[in-house]
């Protein structure tokens, strides 16, 4: 495990399930096996506000009450975020991801390291590397509504890959009768209601609502690590794992 560059990330980025930019990059490290690039880990600036972060560290609510500007400054100074962990397929299954996380966690000199990752539900390598999972409690009624919407779209023939790809979704949607299109719109209305509750004012486009439905049913896991260096002994430890019902992963 050694210091890497943006070129190392670019060499493997197509293998990651998220194609968007990893954020404001602070550091990149790479794993090398022999002479081959086996994996990369990208550290980036933290997200401004995260509910599970406040659940793990309740004192942050007090910091927030002092003003958003000072809160954001505090978060940027004391947190760093793992934005990407990518392992080349040839080297998967031998612990590369665990070592990329474990060996680099202390290197950024922050009291806290955090990450949001959907795949953490299915591959607990972050926890094996020493991070603590904070599973925010899900709203059972909300999950039932989203699940019912997904099942309705399944009945109409939608697969997960169709819902996630806007162009495939549009083609699939156009292939249906007027009555079936109405059923699709009715099913996806629950997503629009969700975003209006979050403060969005504009109507959510249908194709975007379809992809959001899948994402809302598969929210990312939040994990946090407290630096054990004596320099950070005065910072609070994250609370124990908050359990919640396991998320339902829609079938493909």
Q: What function would you assign to each model-found segment?
A:
Residues 87-106:
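Conserved acetyl-CoA-binding loop-helix of GNAT-fold acetyltransferases
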Residues 1-81, 105-252:
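Terminal substrate-recognition subdomain of acyl/acetyltransferases
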């Amino acid at each position: 495990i050694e210091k890497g560059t943006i070129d190392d990330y670019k060499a493997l980025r197509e293998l990651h399930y998220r194609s968007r930019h990893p954020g404001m990059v602070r550091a990149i490290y790479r794993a090398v096996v022999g002479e081959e690039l086996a994996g990369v880990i990208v550290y980036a600036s933290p997200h401004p506000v995260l509910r599970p972060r406040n659940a793990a560290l309740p004192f942050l609510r007090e910091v927030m009450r002092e003003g958003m500007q000072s809160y954001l400054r505090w978060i940027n100074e004391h947190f760093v975020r793992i934005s990407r962990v990518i392992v080349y397929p040839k080297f998967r299954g031998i612990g590369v991801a665990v070592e990329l996380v474990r060996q680099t966690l202390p290197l950024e000199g922050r009291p806290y390291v955090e990450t949001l990752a959907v795949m953490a539900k299915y591959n607990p390598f972050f926890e094996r590397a020493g991070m603590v999972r904070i599973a925010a409690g899900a709203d059972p009624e909300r999950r039932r509504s989203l699940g019912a919407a997904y099942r309705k779209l399944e009945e109409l023939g939608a697969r997960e890959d169709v819902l996630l790809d806007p162009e495939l979704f549009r083609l699939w949607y156009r292939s249906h009768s007027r009555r079936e299109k109405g059923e699709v719109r009715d099913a996806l209305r629950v997503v629009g209601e969700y975003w209006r509750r979050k403060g969005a004012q504009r109507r959510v486009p249908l194709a975007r609502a379809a992809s959001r439905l899948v994402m809302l049913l598969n929210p990312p896991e939040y994990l946090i690590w407290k630096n054990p260096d004596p320099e950070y002994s005065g910072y609070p430890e994250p609370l124990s794992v908050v359990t919640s019902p396991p998320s339902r992963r829609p079938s493909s």
